[in-house]
Amino acid sequence: MEAPPKCALKFSNYIVKHIEFILNEVPEKDEKIRLNVNIDTEIRYNKNEPNKFITIIKITAGEKKDFAKSPVYLSVEVWGFFEVIEEAIDKVRQFAEINSVAILFPYVRALISTITANANIPPVILPPINVAGMMANIEEVKEENTEKQETEAYE
């Protein structure tokens, strides 16, 4: 009997680097809280150990400066620590980046729900996301911004 194939991506640990919660007005118990949510991701590779990397997810929800628009402001930053098996580093880097966000995102969702539920307000429950689609959109925006900056530099 063959051993199952080794997974190319290993999730080692995660830490919560930042939490900020501001309650502007107490919503009614049955009121649904609607917030504008911004999600940002970043991947940092270890120069000394190229098979190790950190995935950072930053989420802000609500308006910090305009409380009239938002009863709640929330900002969290969570770091996940990952490792790729060395034989597969070049082949799976993009795959690993997308999957590391997909692995880490439920922890961030749970953190946000817990913070708001423990604040004794209706919990904010982020929906599941299509990580591959989100990452593709982020890359498109980055490429557009890079092209725009290059164009502006030559004008």
Swiss-Prot record:
Organism of this sequence: Methanocaldococcus jannaschii (strain ATCC 43067 / DSM 2661 / JAL-1 / JCM 10045 / NBRC 100440)
Concerning InterPro entries, the annotation shows:
SecB (IPR003708), SecB-like_sf (IPR035958)
| Protein name per the record | Uncharacterized protein MJ0357
Recorded hits in Gene3D superfamilies, A to Z, give: SecB-like
- GO BP terms: protein tetramerization; protein transport
> Can you tell me where the transmembrane regions are?
none
| Molecular function GO terms recorded | unfolded protein binding
